[in-house]
Amino acid sequence: MITDLTKEHPNKTLWRFLLPMLFSVMFQQIYNIADSMIAGRFAGEDALAAVGASYPITIIFMAFAVGMNLGASVVVSRLFGAEDRGGVKCAVTTAFISSMVLGIILTLFGYFFNHQMMRWIRTPQNIMADGVLYLKIYIFGIIFLMLYNVCTGVFTALGDSKTPLYFLLGSSAGNIILDYIFVAKFQWGVSGVAWATFIAQGVSAVLALVTLLGRLQKFAGKEKQSWFDKKLFAQIMAIAIPSILQQSVLSVGNLFVQGIVNQFGSAVVAGYSGAIKLNTFAINIFMTLGSCLSSYTAQNIGAGKKERIPLGFRTGVKLSELTALPFVILYFIFSRQMMGLFLGAESVEAISAGMAFLKIVSPWYFMIVIKLMTDGIIRGSGAMVYFVVATVPDLILRIGFALVLTKSFGSTGIWMAWPFGWIVATTLTLIFYRKLGYKNDKSSNF
């Protein structure tokens, strides 16, 4: 269902729009966590560590998919808000063509350099072979990853957050079932985990594409539209490239962090792998709220209703703080039980490392959600320079403090670096939000 985000009060509009997106992300993260749970429980601690060691590299590829998602979403949102239906259709096909070309390039790069990338992050030798195997299979699904993310970006831009949910419900269930069959029954190890993800991702991408192409039949303009428009391509990439750079910088930072973690051995890597999956689960939920605000902001700018943006920002922050509360309680108080999802009681060192991460990082969710909501407004406004600049200090501080603190606190020092980066990044995004001028409206006092 297509939803106009420019009319009703943000409290009602954002909440109704958000719920299906939240469920979508939750199910997506559940099957990501299921990979690690099944790997750890049925293939062993080393298998969990191997999947976890390759994770920061997969996030680099994800950065490109997310960038194209944002580029398509913001441009389509503006055209939809301006009621340019023909432009919407052309923007979508332009985004598809661009993402497919990019996907092919990334696949070729990943295929030829996967082993080198695993060596760059100093992957422990006992998990190197499994890590490379997982990464090779994952790389074959990059085109599906790009395709699915562009589709979901367009659905979100049109105010339809329910359709992606339906795809994810099916693919999440299928992924978990295939994980169990391939790993627990067939004993395929990490390759079973990778193939399960590949199949689930492929099915979701194809279903999303077929459904979206059907919807586009209703968006015929007065004049015949081309399949690829250079001007729209430039607009999409103006949003996508800074986002890709920002996400890539973060991903490279995560590679450095993974390299530091890897020096402490496979047990700490396994603990970190489980904890970072839980952390990513929470962060992606919060980022979904930010994505809602991006679509909300872009649609209202396209409709000439900028005065609605500050109220939407306040609503988003309130919702995100409420969303953060259960994660903080769960991860801080029940950290041992959370790590027990991935590892058996015999993995004492790994569980201890994961618990330390969760207890140190989770209380700061109340701060990082403010940054992520502000990011949503900034992206929707097209101010991508601000979006990128606010990320770099977070990365530098996180790596710098990790290197320094590990000398005194061991692996725990790595986890302690997270809050320092988040404090600076949140402060910067709030400064940039004020520079956009939306705070000048009397209704926008925050």
Please name every model-derived segment.
Residues 43-56, 131, 135, 194, ...:
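Small-residue hotspots at the loop-to-helix junctions and early N-terminal turns
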Residues 5-42, 56-71, 75, 100-107, ...:
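N-terminal transmembrane alpha-helices
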Residues 48-108, 145-164, 271-335, 368-382, ...:
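Small-residue-rich hydrophobic transmembrane alpha-helices
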Residues 1-18, 76-141, 185-241, 297-363, ...:
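Short alpha-helical transmembrane segments in multi-pass integral membrane proteins
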Residues 16-35, 137, 148, 171, ...:
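Transmembrane helical elements of multi-pass membrane transporters/channels
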Residues 22, 26, 30, 34, ...:
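Generic alpha-helical transmembrane segments of integral inner-membrane proteins
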Residues 26, 30-48, 118-125, 181-188, ...:
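Helix-terminus/linker motif at the lipid-water interface of multi-pass membrane proteins
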Residues 69, 138-156, 164-175, 193-208, ...:
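Short runs within selected transmembrane alpha-helices of multi-pass transporters and secretion channels
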